[in-house]
């Protein structure tokens, strides 16, 4: 091996021909190709270069750098480093092999041409860019390709992985990602998206390290950061995010975490203890440097508003039906009309606050409404002379108490609450299956957790019956928010399972081993379902699973199941009970299938357990809305009917059972969702025991 710094006595030093004008040094990539036909296994030929000739002082020297060799059959160009004696275009370019960039080994000498992507301003002398290894190793020739790279670490870019990537992959990156300040993406999640893209387009993926170099060559200036809590941190690409219209937003394996990380860091709320009132003066000096928690939450709320339905139209309230009810002496029809106006304004203000995701103001809004002091000497609220421009006012607390003691007024207010809270649910969670950020989900759950306490505190001093009625409705609202956010969380977790081909195949294999005849035999005594219906559902489930259906397709299938099973009860007073019976039977059958999978130690038990939880919860959601549609009520009203077990009237249940008992005498044919066998045996002692 020869040392390139040996001076004129070194036989491995390159002789340079004087150029017309000196060219400033600039980092550059030069691609040359050896067209020799040296077979593999033959020792590489070493080029013996002549001794150095005197070089004019105005010629800039060529600095040693790294030369790497790649087999000629591979279109791979590795990275290295060089300081070249010519300029180049600093804009990022995609380099590919070109016939115009060849180095041919000929007896008469050698000719070197610059790659086709180099600018035309390169000097025309024949020794441009020819360098040797840092250690002075002679240039190795043979069949293959050489790539001479830029000389500074900060200017290294991956040409190899860009040239090796298909145009479809590069276009996919540009279509789905964009650079942005203050945002980040988990490195593992981005690579998982790439693997899915390769699987869909039948491409051979590169490894994670090579993909990282490809990302950096397409999106310049990316940095890597380790983000997350201690013990649960992940590497992130900082400065890149998914485009808002990218379909990958619905295909996240970790949607909640990614959605949170894609928020600009300056919008993240930093929850700090609230300052005391006596320290407000001291904290005013820092108000310009640090945003308050309220400001941070408002900024985050603006980001989250794209996930809610801010265009929801608030329905009209019904008029109170006083009938022949006698009002108290302290309550007049004038007061009832005033209550209608102010309560409508109060509910509209509540909807506006929730649409702006300013949950912390709900408590203040309730306190101001239910604890208003008298504004006049007689304690009576003023009404405008004309209804065209109603005056916004509040009723004093004692007047509200007197009005709420009237049963028709209390029931009217309960109906208004059902309409209000249903509108809030449809605003916050317009689609239970749509991915939403975990920060928004957690904010909704915290809001639901605080509702009952806020209302009880605001209504302190009101009669207990009034408080129970109001809290009963708000409890149904809070429970609905918790169920829907849990359903949304399950949907995002199951989405990754349903998109995994290997997991789906394993689930189908394990499901085919389940003895459904035994399941039907054990469940028939309890559920009394038609065997043909069970077999049809089993077949449809397997077909849908085999087709690797998406979550939306599964949701459509579940909706069709509910329609098919409950259609015979449409328009019947027994529809709500038939729907509840269907939920019980669906849950019982799915439990039997999970039991069989558990006993067989099925490899896909975890996937089935997750899918079962999701489908049970979504079936509950569908039945809830079907019952509400059949009864003409809101889903909040349907769920609020039995939300308080302590005040649940067993008399109503007994009356319902008695009414169903009369109908069972006329209909004892054992319909799929009719009375359970045990109840028919109780009403008909001569009924034979089946399934024992």
Swiss-Prot record:
Primary localization class, coarse: nucleus
PTM annotation (Phosphoserine): residues: 26, 386
Role: Transcription factor that acts as a key regulator of spermatogenesis. Acts by regulating expression of genes required for the haploid phase during spermiogenesis, such as genes required for cilium assembly and function. Recognizes and binds the X-box, a regulatory motif with DNA sequence 5'-GTNRCC(0-3N)RGYAAC-3' present on promoters. Probably activates transcription of the testis-specific histone gene H1-6.
Tissue: Expressed at highest level in testis. Expressed at lower level in thymus. Also expressed in stomach, kidney, liver, brain and heart. Weakly expressed in spleen and lung. Within testis, most abundantly present in spermatocytes: present from pachytene spermatocytes to early spermatids (at protein level). Also present in non-germinal tissues.
Basic and acidic residues biased stretches: 660-685
One Gene Ontology cellular component annotation held by this UniProt entry: cytoplasm
Protein known as: DNA-binding protein RFX2
Species, as recorded: Rattus norvegicus (Rat)
DNA-binding region in chain numbering: 169-244
Subunit structure comment from the entry: Homodimer; probably only forms homodimers in testis. Heterodimer; heterodimerizes with RFX1 and RFX3.
Record InterPro entries: DNA-bd_RFX, RFX-like, RFX1_trans_act, WH-like_DNA-bd_sf, WH_DNA-bd_sf
């Amino acid at each position: 091996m020869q040392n390139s710094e040996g001076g004129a006595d070194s036989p491995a030093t390159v002789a340079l021909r004087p150029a017309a004008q000196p060219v400033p040094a600039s980092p550059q990539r030069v691609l040359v190709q050896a067209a020799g036909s040296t077979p593999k296994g033959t020792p590489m030929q070493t080029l013996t270069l002549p001794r150095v000739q005197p070089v004019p002082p105005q010629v800039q020297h060529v600095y040693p750098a790294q030369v790497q060799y790649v087999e000629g059959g591979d279109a791979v160009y590795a990275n290295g480093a060089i300081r070249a004696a010519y300029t180049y275009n600093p804009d990022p370019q995609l380099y590919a092999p070109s016939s115009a960039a060849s180095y041919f080994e000929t007896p008469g000498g050698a000719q070197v041409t610059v790659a086709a992507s180099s600018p035309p301003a390169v000097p025309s002398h024949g020794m441009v860019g020819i360098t040797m290894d840092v250690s002075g190793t002679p240039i190795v020739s043979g069949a293959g390709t050489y790539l001479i790279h830029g000389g500074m670490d900060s200017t290294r870019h991956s040409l190899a992985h860009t040239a090796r990537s298909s145009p479809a992959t590069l276009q996919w990156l540009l279509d789905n990602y964009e650079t942005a300040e203050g945002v980040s993406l988990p490195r593992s999640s981005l690579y998982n998206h790439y693997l899915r893209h390769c699987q869909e387009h039948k491409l051979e993926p590169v490894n994670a390290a090579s993909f990282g170099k490809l990302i950096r060559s397409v999106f310049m200036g990316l940095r890597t950061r380790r983000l997350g809590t201690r013990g649960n941190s992940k590497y992130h690409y900082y400065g890149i995010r998914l485009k808002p219209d990218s379909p990958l937003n619905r295909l996240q394996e970790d949607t909640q975490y990614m959605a949170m990380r894609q928020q600009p860091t300056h919008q993240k709320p930093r929850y700090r203890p609230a300052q005391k009132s006596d320290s407000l003066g001291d904290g005013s000096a820092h108000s310009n440097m640090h945003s308050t928690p309220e400001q941070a939450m408002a900024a985050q709320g603006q980001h989250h508003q794209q996930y809610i339905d801010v265009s929801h139209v608030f329905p009209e309230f019904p008029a109170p039906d006083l009938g022949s009810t006698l009002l108290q002496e302290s309550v007049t029809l004038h007061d009832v009309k005033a209550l209608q106006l102010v309560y409508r304004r109060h509910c509209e203000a509540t909807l506006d606050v929730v649409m702006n995701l300013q949950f912390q103001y709900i408590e203040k809004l309730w306190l101001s409404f239910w604890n208003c002091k008298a504004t006049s000497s007689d304690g009576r609220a003023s009404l405008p002379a004309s209804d065209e421009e109603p005056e916004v006012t509040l009723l004093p607390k004692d007047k509200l108490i007197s009005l709420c003691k009237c049963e028709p007024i209390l029931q009217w207010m309960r109906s208004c609450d059902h309409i209000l809270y249903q509108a809030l649910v449809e605003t916050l969670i317009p689609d239970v299956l749509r991915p939403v950020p975990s920060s928004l989900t957690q904010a909704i759950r915290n809001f639901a957790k605080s509702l009952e306490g806020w209302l009880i505190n605001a209504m302190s001093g009101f009669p207990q019956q009034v408080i129970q009625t109001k809290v009963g409705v708000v409890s149904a609202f809070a429970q609905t928010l918790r169920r829907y956010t849990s359903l949304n969380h399950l949907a995002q977790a199951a989405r990754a399972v349903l998109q995994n081909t290997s997991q789906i195949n394993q689930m189908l294999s394990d499901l085919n081993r389940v003895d459904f005849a035994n399941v039907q035999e054990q469940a028939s005594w309890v559920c009394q379902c038609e065997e043909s219906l069970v077999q049809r559902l089993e077949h449809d489930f397997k077909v849908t699973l085999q087709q690797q259906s998406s979550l939306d397709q599964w949701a459509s299938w579940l909706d069709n199941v509910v329609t098919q099973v409950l259609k015979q009860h449409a328009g019947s007073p027994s529809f709500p009970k038939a729907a509840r019976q269907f939920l019980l039977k669906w849950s019982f059958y799915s439990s039997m299938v999970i039991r069989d999978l558990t006993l067989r130690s099925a490899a896909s038990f975890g996937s089935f357990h997750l899918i079962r939880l999701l489908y049970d919860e979504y079936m509950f959601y569908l039945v809830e809305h079907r019952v509400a549609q059949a009864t003409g009520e809101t889903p909040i009203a349907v769920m609020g009917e039995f939300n308080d077990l302590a005040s649940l009237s067993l008399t109503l249940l007994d009356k319902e059972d008695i009414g169903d008992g009369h109908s069972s005498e006329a209909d004892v044919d054992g319909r799929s969702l009719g009375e359970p066998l045990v109840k028919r045996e109780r009403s008909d002692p001569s009924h034979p025991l089946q399934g024992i």
